[in-house]
Amino acid sequence: MRCPSCQHHGTRVLDSRPVDEGRSIRRRRECEQCHYRFTTFEKVEEMPLIVVKKQGMREEFSRDKILRGLIKACEKRPVALEELEKITQDIERELRNQGVAEVKSETIGEMVMERLSKVDEVAYVRFASVYRQFKDLNVFIEELKELIKKEQR
């Protein structure tokens, strides 16, 4: 690591500690030549994950967008914010572990619905009604019947 003060290449690490929930490492360094002390941050460079929308448009993956949708679906429901954050984190981790550069928005929606159905059925129905854009009451009733079948298994 080059010293920002004298440009010497030799530095030593005085202290290292994880930050940002373990996603980064903060290092305190000292130049071997001029003894200037400085801090560096090291983190894994994640490749951008692109979401392909229904109309073919592409946008960068946003975990906040998933979390906002979950919060809206769980409004006035007994679901802790921590649970919704965990769902969001699990979905992002699963998508990144697939090692693909692009993912369809439908895939993400299905992942959200699968997890939400295990947490709160009312929130699941709310999310599904917006996500699937039910055309009429019969389609909505069919979705409810499927949910009841799953619950009885």
From Swiss-Prot:
Presence of the UniProt keyword Mitochondrion in the record: no
Record bears the keyword Cell division: no
Residue spans, zinc finger unnamed: 3-34
Cofactor(s) in the UniProt record: Zn(2+)
Residues of the ATP-cone domain: 49-139
Taxonomic superkingdom: Bacteria
Transmembrane segments: none
Any one of the GO BP annotations: negative regulation of DNA-templated transcription
Cofactor: record remark: Binds 1 zinc ion.
GO terms, molecular function: ATP binding; DNA binding; zinc ion binding
InterPro entries noted in UniProt: ATP-cone_dom, NrdR-like_N, RNR_NrdR-like
Record's keyword terms, sorted: ATP-binding, DNA-binding, Metal-binding, Nucleotide-binding, Repressor, Transcription, Transcription regulation, Zinc, Zinc-finger
Role played: Negatively regulates transcription of bacterial ribonucleotide reductase nrd genes and operons by binding to NrdR-boxes.
Entry similarity comment: Belongs to the NrdR family.
The protein, known as: Transcriptional repressor NrdR
Species this chain originates from: Geobacillus sp. (strain WCH70)
Gene expressing this chain: nrdR
